[in-house]
Amino acid sequence: MHPTRTKLLAAAALLAALAAPAGAADVTLLNVSYDPTRELYEQVNSAFAAQWKASRGQGLTVKQSHGGSGKQARAVLDGLEADVVTLALAYDVDAVAKGGLVKPDWQKRLPDNASPYTSTIVFLVRKGNPKGIKDWNDLVRPGVQVITPNPKTSGGARWNYLAAWAYAHQAFKGDEAKVKGFIKALFANVPVLDSGARGSTTTFVERGIGDVLLAWENEAFLAVDRLGKGELEIVVPKLSILAEPPVAVVDSVVDRRGTRAVAEAYLEFLYTEQGQEIAARNHYRPRNAKVAARYASAFPKVQLVTVDGAFGGWQQAQKTHFADGGLFDQLYTPGR
Protein backbone atom coordinates (compact mmCIF):
# COMPACT_ATOMS: atom_id res chain seq x y z
CA MET A 1 0.00 0.00 0.00
CA HIS A 2 1.38 3.45 -0.91
CA PRO A 3 2.61 5.40 2.19
CA THR A 4 0.85 8.60 1.07
CA ARG A 5 -2.47 6.72 0.92
CA THR A 6 -1.77 5.36 4.42
CA LYS A 7 -1.25 8.87 5.79
CA LEU A 8 -4.41 10.11 4.09
CA LEU A 9 -6.44 7.28 5.59
CA ALA A 10 -5.05 7.97 9.05
CA ALA A 11 -5.91 11.65 8.67
CA ALA A 12 -9.39 10.80 7.40
CA ALA A 13 -9.99 8.53 10.37
CA LEU A 14 -8.90 11.29 12.76
CA LEU A 15 -11.07 13.92 11.06
CA ALA A 16 -14.06 11.59 11.22
CA ALA A 17 -13.40 11.09 14.89
CA LEU A 18 -13.25 14.83 15.56
CA ALA A 19 -16.36 15.61 13.53
CA ALA A 20 -18.91 14.33 16.03
CA PRO A 21 -19.90 16.09 19.24
CA ALA A 22 -18.07 15.04 22.39
CA GLY A 23 -20.00 12.94 24.85
CA ALA A 24 -22.28 11.41 22.24
CA ALA A 25 -24.27 8.35 23.27
CA ASP A 26 -22.39 5.07 23.18
CA VAL A 27 -22.51 3.22 19.88
CA THR A 28 -22.41 -0.45 18.91
CA LEU A 29 -21.18 -2.00 15.67
CA LEU A 30 -21.58 -5.56 14.43
CA ASN A 31 -18.68 -7.00 12.43
CA VAL A 32 -19.79 -10.12 10.56
CA SER A 33 -16.61 -11.98 9.71
CA TYR A 34 -15.34 -15.33 8.53
CA ASP A 35 -14.30 -18.21 10.74
CA PRO A 36 -10.71 -17.73 11.98
CA THR A 37 -10.60 -13.95 12.55
CA ARG A 38 -11.84 -13.97 16.16
CA GLU A 39 -8.49 -13.23 17.76
CA LEU A 40 -7.54 -10.59 15.18
CA TYR A 41 -10.71 -8.58 15.61
CA GLU A 42 -10.76 -8.86 19.39
CA GLN A 43 -7.49 -6.91 19.35
CA VAL A 44 -8.57 -4.54 16.56
CA ASN A 45 -11.82 -3.78 18.36
CA SER A 46 -10.08 -2.99 21.64
CA ALA A 47 -7.52 -0.70 20.01
CA PHE A 48 -10.01 1.12 17.80
CA ALA A 49 -12.56 1.57 20.60
CA ALA A 50 -9.86 3.17 22.77
CA GLN A 51 -8.87 5.51 19.95
CA TRP A 52 -12.51 6.39 19.23
CA LYS A 53 -13.21 7.09 22.90
CA ALA A 54 -10.12 9.28 23.25
CA SER A 55 -10.86 11.34 20.13
CA ARG A 56 -14.65 11.55 20.33
CA GLY A 57 -15.56 10.91 23.93
CA GLN A 58 -17.94 8.24 22.70
CA GLY A 59 -17.97 4.69 24.00
CA LEU A 60 -17.87 2.00 21.33
CA THR A 61 -18.62 -1.71 21.48
CA VAL A 62 -17.85 -3.85 18.45
CA LYS A 63 -19.69 -7.16 18.46
CA GLN A 64 -18.38 -10.06 16.40
CA SER A 65 -20.08 -12.82 14.44
CA HIS A 66 -18.03 -15.65 12.92
CA GLY A 67 -18.67 -18.61 10.65
CA GLY A 68 -17.95 -19.92 7.18
CA SER A 69 -17.67 -16.91 4.86
CA GLY A 70 -20.40 -18.04 2.47
CA LYS A 71 -22.76 -18.80 5.35
CA GLN A 72 -22.03 -15.39 6.87
CA ALA A 73 -22.82 -13.61 3.60
CA ARG A 74 -26.13 -15.46 3.41
CA ALA A 75 -26.90 -14.56 7.02
CA VAL A 76 -26.44 -10.86 6.22
CA LEU A 77 -28.69 -11.21 3.18
CA ASP A 78 -31.24 -12.93 5.40
CA GLY A 79 -31.32 -10.04 7.87
CA LEU A 80 -28.32 -10.22 10.20
CA GLU A 81 -27.68 -6.49 10.75
CA ALA A 82 -23.96 -6.17 10.06
CA ASP A 83 -22.52 -2.67 10.05
CA VAL A 84 -19.40 -4.07 8.40
CA VAL A 85 -18.49 -7.36 6.77
CA THR A 86 -14.93 -8.70 6.85
CA LEU A 87 -15.20 -11.84 4.77
CA ALA A 88 -12.83 -14.40 3.26
CA LEU A 89 -13.17 -13.47 -0.39
CA ALA A 90 -14.58 -10.83 -2.70
CA TYR A 91 -17.28 -13.08 -4.13
CA ASP A 92 -19.04 -13.20 -0.75
CA VAL A 93 -19.07 -9.41 -0.42
CA ASP A 94 -20.29 -9.17 -4.01
CA ALA A 95 -23.16 -11.48 -3.05
CA VAL A 96 -24.17 -9.03 -0.31
CA ALA A 97 -23.86 -6.18 -2.82
CA LYS A 98 -26.08 -7.99 -5.31
CA GLY A 99 -28.68 -8.19 -2.56
CA GLY A 100 -28.72 -4.38 -2.46
CA LEU A 101 -27.10 -4.03 0.98
CA VAL A 102 -23.64 -2.88 -0.14
CA LYS A 103 -23.00 -0.42 -2.97
CA PRO A 104 -21.39 -1.94 -6.08
CA ASP A 105 -18.27 0.26 -5.80
CA TRP A 106 -17.27 -1.18 -2.42
CA GLN A 107 -13.83 -2.36 -3.61
CA LYS A 108 -12.90 1.14 -4.79
CA ARG A 109 -13.49 2.82 -1.43
CA LEU A 110 -10.38 1.49 0.29
CA PRO A 111 -6.83 0.68 -0.88
CA ASP A 112 -5.79 -2.68 -2.31
CA ASN A 113 -9.31 -3.52 -3.51
CA ALA A 114 -10.55 -3.16 0.08
CA SER A 115 -8.27 -5.97 1.28
CA PRO A 116 -6.18 -4.60 4.19
CA TYR A 117 -4.14 -7.77 4.76
CA THR A 118 -3.42 -11.00 2.93
CA SER A 119 -2.81 -14.63 3.77
CA THR A 120 -2.13 -17.90 2.00
CA ILE A 121 -2.75 -21.63 2.40
CA VAL A 122 -0.30 -23.92 4.21
CA PHE A 123 -0.34 -27.44 5.67
CA LEU A 124 -0.53 -28.30 9.37
CA VAL A 125 0.82 -31.73 10.31
CA ARG A 126 1.42 -33.64 13.51
CA LYS A 127 4.73 -33.60 15.40
CA GLY A 128 7.52 -35.19 13.42
CA ASN A 129 5.40 -35.17 10.23
CA PRO A 130 4.84 -38.95 10.43
CA LYS A 131 3.36 -39.18 6.91
CA GLY A 132 6.27 -37.23 5.38
CA ILE A 133 4.04 -34.59 3.80
CA LYS A 134 6.06 -31.99 1.88
CA ASP A 135 3.88 -30.77 -0.99
CA TRP A 136 0.48 -31.08 -2.64
CA ASN A 137 1.30 -34.36 -4.38
CA ASP A 138 1.62 -36.05 -0.98
CA LEU A 139 -2.03 -35.30 -0.21
CA VAL A 140 -3.34 -37.79 -2.76
CA ARG A 141 -1.33 -40.76 -1.50
CA PRO A 142 -3.38 -43.72 -0.23
CA GLY A 143 -3.71 -43.68 3.54
CA VAL A 144 -3.30 -39.91 3.95
CA GLN A 145 -6.31 -38.23 5.58
CA VAL A 146 -6.75 -34.57 4.59
CA ILE A 147 -8.84 -32.14 6.64
CA THR A 148 -10.40 -29.16 4.85
CA PRO A 149 -13.75 -27.37 5.22
CA ASN A 150 -16.59 -27.46 2.72
CA PRO A 151 -16.07 -25.14 -0.27
CA LYS A 152 -19.84 -24.66 -0.50
CA THR A 153 -19.89 -22.82 2.86
CA SER A 154 -16.30 -21.84 3.72
CA GLY A 155 -14.19 -19.17 2.08
CA GLY A 156 -11.00 -20.77 3.36
CA ALA A 157 -12.03 -24.05 1.74
CA ARG A 158 -12.41 -22.31 -1.60
CA TRP A 159 -8.90 -20.91 -1.27
CA ASN A 160 -7.68 -24.44 -0.35
CA TYR A 161 -9.34 -25.96 -3.40
CA LEU A 162 -8.04 -23.31 -5.80
CA ALA A 163 -4.49 -23.57 -4.42
CA ALA A 164 -4.61 -27.35 -4.99
CA TRP A 165 -6.00 -26.83 -8.50
CA ALA A 166 -3.24 -24.30 -9.30
CA TYR A 167 -0.59 -26.77 -8.16
CA ALA A 168 -2.08 -29.55 -10.27
CA HIS A 169 -2.42 -27.26 -13.29
CA GLN A 170 1.29 -26.47 -13.06
CA ALA A 171 2.36 -30.04 -12.27
CA PHE A 172 0.36 -31.55 -15.13
CA LYS A 173 1.11 -28.72 -17.58
CA GLY A 174 -2.54 -27.79 -17.98
CA ASP A 175 -3.83 -31.31 -18.73
CA GLU A 176 -7.38 -30.81 -17.42
CA ALA A 177 -8.21 -34.50 -17.15
CA LYS A 178 -5.18 -35.05 -14.92
CA VAL A 179 -5.96 -31.91 -12.89
CA LYS A 180 -9.50 -33.15 -12.28
CA GLY A 181 -8.16 -36.56 -11.35
CA PHE A 182 -5.84 -34.96 -8.81
CA ILE A 183 -8.63 -32.94 -7.18
CA LYS A 184 -10.90 -35.99 -7.13
CA ALA A 185 -8.18 -38.06 -5.44
CA LEU A 186 -7.46 -35.31 -2.91
CA PHE A 187 -11.09 -35.02 -1.82
CA ALA A 188 -11.40 -38.80 -1.71
CA ASN A 189 -8.89 -38.53 1.15
CA VAL A 190 -11.09 -36.05 3.08
CA PRO A 191 -13.07 -37.89 5.80
CA VAL A 192 -15.24 -34.95 6.91
CA LEU A 193 -16.12 -31.51 5.53
CA ASP A 194 -16.75 -29.00 8.32
CA SER A 195 -18.70 -25.84 7.50
CA GLY A 196 -15.85 -23.45 8.36
CA ALA A 197 -12.09 -23.19 8.87
CA ARG A 198 -12.21 -23.05 12.66
CA GLY A 199 -14.36 -26.18 12.71
CA SER A 200 -11.76 -28.01 10.62
CA THR A 201 -9.02 -26.85 12.97
CA THR A 202 -11.02 -28.27 15.87
CA THR A 203 -11.49 -31.55 14.00
CA PHE A 204 -7.75 -31.84 13.38
CA VAL A 205 -6.32 -30.46 16.62
CA GLU A 206 -8.84 -31.35 19.31
CA ARG A 207 -10.53 -34.43 17.84
CA GLY A 208 -7.29 -35.81 16.45
CA ILE A 209 -8.76 -36.66 13.05
CA GLY A 210 -6.57 -36.53 9.94
CA ASP A 211 -2.90 -36.43 9.01
CA VAL A 212 -2.80 -32.94 7.49
CA LEU A 213 -4.95 -29.83 7.77
CA LEU A 214 -5.21 -27.39 4.86
CA ALA A 215 -5.28 -24.09 6.69
CA TRP A 216 -5.11 -20.35 6.43
CA GLU A 217 -1.52 -19.42 7.29
CA ASN A 218 -2.70 -17.36 10.26
CA GLU A 219 -4.86 -20.22 11.54
CA ALA A 220 -1.93 -22.65 11.28
CA PHE A 221 0.33 -20.34 13.29
CA LEU A 222 -2.41 -19.86 15.87
CA ALA A 223 -2.86 -23.61 16.22
CA VAL A 224 0.86 -24.09 16.79
CA ASP A 225 1.12 -21.14 19.19
CA ARG A 226 -1.96 -21.70 21.29
CA LEU A 227 -3.58 -25.05 20.57
CA GLY A 228 -0.84 -27.42 19.52
CA LYS A 229 1.29 -27.46 22.69
CA GLY A 230 4.34 -28.48 20.68
CA GLU A 231 2.49 -31.25 18.88
CA LEU A 232 2.00 -29.58 15.49
CA GLU A 233 4.24 -28.40 12.65
CA ILE A 234 3.66 -26.14 9.64
CA VAL A 235 4.62 -27.35 6.16
CA VAL A 236 4.79 -24.70 3.43
CA PRO A 237 4.08 -26.03 -0.09
CA LYS A 238 6.17 -24.83 -3.03
CA LEU A 239 3.14 -23.16 -4.60
CA SER A 240 0.08 -21.65 -2.96
CA ILE A 241 -2.41 -18.84 -3.55
CA LEU A 242 -2.54 -15.18 -2.57
CA ALA A 243 -5.63 -14.94 -0.38
CA GLU A 244 -7.02 -11.40 -0.14
CA PRO A 245 -9.82 -11.17 2.44
CA PRO A 246 -11.88 -8.01 1.80
CA VAL A 247 -13.81 -5.62 4.05
CA ALA A 248 -16.84 -3.40 3.40
CA VAL A 249 -19.36 -1.17 5.10
CA VAL A 250 -22.92 -2.49 4.79
CA ASP A 251 -24.48 0.69 3.41
CA SER A 252 -28.13 -0.10 4.03
CA VAL A 253 -27.49 -0.90 7.70
CA VAL A 254 -25.17 1.97 8.60
CA ASP A 255 -27.46 4.52 6.96
CA ARG A 256 -30.47 3.16 8.81
CA ARG A 257 -28.63 2.96 12.16
CA GLY A 258 -26.66 6.19 11.77
CA THR A 259 -23.33 4.41 12.18
CA ARG A 260 -21.65 5.22 8.87
CA ALA A 261 -18.94 7.51 10.29
CA VAL A 262 -17.76 5.06 12.93
CA ALA A 263 -18.06 2.06 10.60
CA GLU A 264 -15.96 3.74 7.91
CA ALA A 265 -13.37 4.87 10.47
CA TYR A 266 -13.25 1.31 11.83
CA LEU A 267 -12.32 -0.13 8.44
CA GLU A 268 -9.88 2.70 7.74
CA PHE A 269 -8.16 1.86 11.04
CA LEU A 270 -7.18 -1.51 9.58
CA TYR A 271 -4.89 0.33 7.13
CA THR A 272 -3.15 2.48 9.74
CA GLU A 273 0.25 1.43 11.03
CA GLN A 274 -1.33 0.37 14.32
CA GLY A 275 -3.96 -1.71 12.55
CA GLN A 276 -1.35 -3.29 10.29
CA GLU A 277 0.82 -4.11 13.30
CA ILE A 278 -2.12 -5.91 14.92
CA ALA A 279 -2.70 -7.87 11.71
CA ALA A 280 0.96 -8.91 11.52
CA ARG A 281 1.04 -9.98 15.17
CA ASN A 282 -1.90 -12.24 14.39
CA HIS A 283 -0.03 -13.80 11.44
CA TYR A 284 -1.83 -11.95 8.64
CA ARG A 285 0.49 -10.53 5.99
CA PRO A 286 0.36 -6.72 6.25
CA ARG A 287 0.03 -4.43 3.23
CA ASN A 288 1.96 -1.57 4.86
CA ALA A 289 5.55 -1.76 3.60
CA LYS A 290 7.10 -0.57 6.86
CA VAL A 291 5.21 -3.11 8.95
CA ALA A 292 5.82 -5.85 6.38
CA ALA A 293 9.57 -5.20 6.58
CA ARG A 294 9.51 -5.55 10.37
CA TYR A 295 7.76 -8.91 10.10
CA ALA A 296 9.45 -10.23 6.95
CA SER A 297 11.17 -13.09 8.75
CA ALA A 298 7.85 -14.30 10.20
CA PHE A 299 6.34 -15.17 6.82
CA PRO A 300 7.86 -17.92 4.65
CA LYS A 301 8.55 -17.20 1.00
CA VAL A 302 6.29 -19.15 -1.34
CA GLN A 303 5.29 -18.89 -5.00
CA LEU A 304 1.78 -17.43 -5.02
CA VAL A 305 -0.77 -17.48 -7.82
CA THR A 306 -3.72 -15.09 -7.83
CA VAL A 307 -7.40 -15.73 -8.42
CA ASP A 308 -7.46 -13.13 -11.18
CA GLY A 309 -4.40 -14.53 -12.93
CA ALA A 310 -5.09 -18.25 -12.58
CA PHE A 311 -8.90 -18.40 -12.52
CA GLY A 312 -10.21 -15.25 -14.22
CA GLY A 313 -11.45 -13.63 -11.00
CA TRP A 314 -13.87 -14.73 -8.31
CA GLN A 315 -17.03 -14.52 -10.38
CA GLN A 316 -15.59 -16.95 -12.92
CA ALA A 317 -14.03 -19.19 -10.26
CA GLN A 318 -17.32 -19.44 -8.40
CA LYS A 319 -19.28 -20.25 -11.56
CA THR A 320 -16.80 -22.86 -12.78
CA HIS A 321 -15.88 -24.58 -9.53
CA PHE A 322 -18.31 -23.91 -6.69
CA ALA A 323 -21.76 -23.20 -8.13
CA ASP A 324 -24.32 -25.99 -7.93
CA GLY A 325 -23.31 -28.56 -10.52
CA GLY A 326 -19.83 -27.03 -10.87
CA LEU A 327 -16.55 -28.90 -10.88
CA PHE A 328 -16.42 -29.40 -7.12
CA ASP A 329 -19.83 -31.08 -7.17
CA GLN A 330 -18.71 -33.22 -10.09
CA LEU A 331 -15.44 -34.31 -8.48
CA TYR A 332 -16.41 -34.77 -4.83
CA THR A 333 -18.19 -37.95 -3.78
CA PRO A 334 -19.40 -37.77 -0.15
CA GLY A 335 -18.92 -40.72 2.14
CA ARG A 336 -16.02 -42.34 0.34
What are the residue ranges of the model-derived segments?
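Extracellular/periplasmic juxtamembrane helices and adjacent flexible linkers that interface
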Residues: 254-336
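N-terminal segment of the mature folded domain
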Residues: 25-154, 332-336
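Bacterial N-terminal signal peptides that target proteins for export
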Residues: 1-10
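Short beta-strand->loop
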Residues: 32-34, 125-127, 145-172, 187-190, ...
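A bilobed periplasmic-binding-protein/Venus flytrap-type ligand-binding module shared by bacterial periplasmic
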Residues: 120-129, 244-261, 278-282
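Sec/Tat signal peptide C-region and signal peptidase I cleavage site
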Residues: 20-24
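Ligand-binding pocket segment of bilobal, Venus flytrap-like solute-binding proteins
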Residues: 171-238
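Short helix-loop capping/hinge motifs at secondary-structure junctions, enriched
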Residues: 128-134, 153, 166-174, 253-261
